[in-house]
Amino acid sequence: MLAAWNVGAILYLVLTIEMCARSTVDKIRRRGRVQSESNVMTIVLVVSAVIAAQTAIVMELAMVKDLHGTIKAAHIALTVLTIVTAWAFMHSMFALHYAHDFYDSLAHHRPLGLQFVGTPDPEYGDFFYCAFIIGTSGQTADVTFINKPMRRLGMVHSVLAFAFNTILLAMMINIAASLF
């Protein structure tokens, strides 16, 4: 199950990186108009995927305790890879959501949800910066949430990141304990 998750997550991340690298601000604007309609669905997908990955990780860790040698090392490596891919998947999904919502709001003349200092036309990298800063520190550094719906989304992202990071810490302690 973890191998399938990792193949899917890595494929998603590679395709996302490729898409972002090739995108201009105009392409992001077009995608924003098409993809921002699924706000709730994005959150449901992210939460479901991360819960499924974490459940699989817990099940894997329970099994690892009875293994030895290279098989144990391989299972631990797979578990660590799953933790990394689940973490990156979650924040990448939020980054894309932030980008598409930003440009959808711009297209429909609604107040923008985010403000990037000195960057009137943010690119995907700016939104990934925002999402991964929330993912690592629970704050937004120099990106400002400027409307209520986006602040709520940022809060959900921050709470999910906190929960994920707390569970991640517990899992890493468990992995370290299973090594001895």
Task: Name each model-derived stretch.
Residues 70-88:
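Interfacial segments of alpha-helical transmembrane regions
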Residues 28-48:
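Juxtamembrane helix-capping/reentrant segments at transmembrane boundaries
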